[in-house]
Structures are given as structure tokens and as C-alpha cells.
């Protein structure tokens, strides 16, 4: 990780959605229509964050989006509130510099304001870098494999983390 990379993590603004969409389309195979981003921003604006270079304002290099949902706990049979990671992406030139980690830390703090009990996410089974980040840095646990989850037929790992196990903040 390049500790000299000076970034700011802050809420995404509506006029920055095109930059977020560009990062999404250039880095991830899952693409969403603009109204999807608008809905997340409208309902969970505090959990829709961007990262920008400190010395170059409005130069967005990554983003993270969460939503809150109710469902059965990944760790027991009870109805709970979950923070669900919708999307996380960092521009190619800024990967492996700690940007995703910083986005996750700051956004997970925000998601906690919704009194969630756990965090959940899906990640491509071939995305070893992301899996390493989620499991080894953030302590997410693999709950199951969602077969053929993605449009191209790839499996997703369904990972979860109990809120009380947030020992990385």
C-alpha cells in the first residue's frame, strides 16, 4: 500500500454520478442504470461515498454504495437489519493503495447509524483480491456460495460480518 496517497472520503454528490458510473463501467462487469444510483443516493446518501485525491478535488478514484435491508441473520434464525454492500470499485490506477479499505471503513461507520446487526455482500468467486480484503482485513465470514449469481454465470461468495466483530475501526 502506498501510504503517501492522500485521499479524501466524502459523500457522493448528484453531479458526480457520471464519474461513479464511469468507474463502475470500466472496472466491474456489473453495470446499473442511472436510476439505480439515484435511488441509493436518495435513500442512503450518507452510505454512498466517493474517494478523491486530496490535491485534485473532484478527481473521483473510487466509490462505495450500501443499502439497508431486513432479513434472516447469516449467523442464526432471527430477523435483523443488515447493511448490504451494493458496489465498491476503485479506478485501475489506484488499486492496491488502500483506497478500497478506506472506503469500507468510513462507509461501514455510516451504515452502523442505521442500527444494523451485520454486514453482508456478494463477491465474485474469482476476485481473490477483494476476497482477501473482506476476509483477512475485515473478518467477513463465508456463509455460502451463490451458484451462477452473476449474469455471466460466475458464482458469488456470500460473506457476512457481525457488527460486534468490527475490530478494524
Where do the language-model regions lie?
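Conserved Rossmann-like nucleotide-binding pocket used by diverse enzymes
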Residues: 8, 84-86, 119
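Conserved glycine-rich acetyl-CoA-binding loop
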Residues: 87-105, 114, 118, 124-132, ...
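Eukaryotic N-terminal low-complexity, Ser/Thr- and Lys/Arg-rich leader segments
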Residues: 1-13, 164-169
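Conserved catalytic-core motifs of GNAT/GCN5-like acyltransferases
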Residues: 71, 120-122, 135-158
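Short acidic/glycine-enriched loop/turn segments that link adjacent beta-strands
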Residues: 44-45, 127, 150-155
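Acetyl-CoA-dependent GNAT
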Residues: 14-93, 104-114, 162-168
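Intrinsically disordered, low-complexity regulatory tails flanking kinase catalytic domains
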Residues: 1-3, 74-78, 136
Amino acid at each position: 500500500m502506498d501510504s503517501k496517497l492522500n485521499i479524501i472520503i466524502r459523500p457522493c454528490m448528484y453531479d458526480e454520478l457520471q464519474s461513479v458510473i464511469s468507474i463502475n463501467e470500466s472496472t466491474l462487469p456489473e453495470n446499473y442504470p442511472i436510476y439505480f444510483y439515484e435511488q441509493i443516493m436518495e435513500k442512503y446518501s450518507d452510505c454512498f461515498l466517493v474517494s478523491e485525491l486530496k490535491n485534485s478535488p473532484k478527481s473521483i478514484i473510487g466509490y462505495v454504495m450500501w443499502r439497508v435491508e431486513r432479513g434472516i441473520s447469516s449467523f442464526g434464525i432471527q430477523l435483523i437489519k443488515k447493511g448490504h454492500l451494493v458496489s465498491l470499485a476503485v479506478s485501475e490506477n489506484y488499486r492496491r493503495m488502500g483506497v478500497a479499505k478506506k472506503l469500507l471503513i468510513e462507509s461501514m461507520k455510516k451504515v452502523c447509524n442505521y442500527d444494523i446487526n451485520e454486514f453482508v455482500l456478494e463477491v465474485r468467486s474469482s476476485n481473490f483480491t477483494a476476497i482477501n480484503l473482506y476476509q483477512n482485513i475485515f473478518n467477513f465470514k463465508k456463509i455460502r456460495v451463490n451458484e451462477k449469481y452473476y449474469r455471466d454465470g460466475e458464482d458469488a461468495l456470500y460473506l457476512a460480518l457481525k457488527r460486534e466483530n468490527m475490530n478494524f475501526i
